[in-house]
Structure formats: structure tokens, C-alpha cells
């Protein structure tokens, strides 16, 4: 079964503009693709057991983060990684969900929402607005 996750990005403060710089897909379940449709990022995956990541950077504040969305055992999941080093691209982070214990746990938790603050106190959140089925929707909120 093919899964899609449509993601809307909200930036709630003008103190640092985040721009998308990278999109990745994991290779399991026939991998996936990213599209942009009507201002939303749309991740299409070949089946359960894969994911995709978006990396955002703010040149204004020297901050970056990776937001990852996926389906595991037929349920959606999400995670956000902040305080990235230059070597921590979305490509690096995305593959860690399939073999690095701390990232594996985030995938296994199958959360419908997740929020975290970075070292500078900025908040980031993912909230799935459609949590079941094969046509999922989520909001990515940058505080």
C-alpha cells in the first residue's frame, strides 16, 4: 500500500527565517518521493517501513534542524533533531532511524505529535492532523 504524508510548515515568529535545504527518503518499502503541492511538502512512500526527512536552516540565527516523517508497522511516526553539526545532514539523520538505538526508539514510538526545544530555546513541533489511513497530514511548527 502506498502512503502519503502532506506537511504544512508554519513559522510563528520573524526572529530567524528557516528555509528548506534538503529532502531525503529512506530506501525500504520501495523508497519514496517528495513533491510540493499548493505550498505543502508531500512525501509519497511505497509502503510501510520507510520515511523521509526535511532539513531547514536559518542563516539569520545559525540554527538548523531535521524533521522526519514516516510509517512503521502501518502507523505514522515523526521526530525532530535540533542542534545539528555541519556533518548532520538529513541524509545522515534519516538513515539513523534504521540502526541507531536512540533514533530507532523514536520510530518505534509511532508518535502522532512531538515537540522539542533547541539549545537556543526555540521550539519545534510536529502534529499529525490526520493520524490513520494511507493519506496522512501533519503540521510542522517552527517557533
Swiss-Prot record:
Signal peptide stretch: none
GO MF annotation terms: carbohydrate binding
Gene3D superfamilies referenced in this protein's UniProt entry, alphabetically: Cytolysin/lectin
InterPro entries per record: Cytolysin/lectin, Fruit_body_lectin_fun
Residues the record lists as binding N-acetyl-beta-D-glucosamine: 82, 103, 114
Ligand binding (beta-D-Gal-(1->3)-alpha-D-GalNAc): 29, 48-49, 73
Keyword set, alphabetical order: Hemagglutinin, Lectin
Additional comment: Each monomer has 2 distinct carbohydrate binding sites, one for galactose-beta-1,3-N-acetylgalactosamine and another for galactose-beta-1,3-N-acetylglucosamine.
Family: Belongs to the fungal fruit body lectin family.
Function noted in UniProt: Lectin that recognizes O-linked galactose-beta-1,3-N-acetylgalactosamine, a disaccharide (Thomsen-Friedenreich antigen or T-disaccharide), present on cell surface glycoproteins. Can also bind galactose-beta-1,3-N-acetylglucosamine. Does not bind monosaccharides. Can be internalized by clathrin-coated vesicles after binding to surface glycoproteins. After internalization it inhibits nuclear import of nuclear localization signal dependent proteins. Inhibits proliferation of malignant cells without cytotoxicity for normal cells.
Subunit structure: Homotetramer.
Protein name: Agaricus bisporus lectin
Gene source species: Agaricus bisporus (White button mushroom)
Lineage: Eukaryota, Fungi, Dikarya, Basidiomycota, Agaricomycotina
